[in-house]
Amino acid sequence: MQGEAKRDYPASIHGQSAWYRQYRYVEDYYARIHLLMEQGQPLCDVLVINPVESLWAGIYPGWADGLTAADPAVGAVEEGYRTVFGSLCAAKADFDFGDEDMLARLGAVESGPDGVRLRIGKMTYRTVVVPKMLTMRASTLEWLKAFGEQGGEVWFTAGRPEYVDAQRSAQANTIPGLDRELADVETALI
């Protein structure tokens, strides 16, 4: 170990702590919040596809300089992801990140009285936002295509991926969806 980490002495939760007797008040407060939050069902209508597999596809010797992407394509994916995150947070939009693997294993498209929704596990979404991606899994493509064909909203904020399963393909152009600028996404979600 080097640097600060080997000199880190976090406070303990034992009798030698000066605030040990008062610690119960803090933990009781958190326990009450936990109980309250556990009773509800989260409601989030926006899913942002995580482009992590595009980043993994762009890794090769020399792809990065420290923590900075040296490859402009990888840098563009990172910047697109950061911009989508910042824009949605600035618009105070509630959203979840969706992993392509979880979508492949747990995904389903459902129609109900409140319209078509994309289900991943226990959560359902009305809108899927696709940030800058280099490649997309074929399974993700099929789920988004089925979702869009049934009336679900799919928004591409930086164009369509040029690769499917890391192979050059125009299949992403078959997904019914809107190519939207981030400003349009922010406005639509407010």
Positions of PLM-derived features:
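Carbohydrate-binding surfaces of carbohydrate-active enzymes
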Residues: 1-190
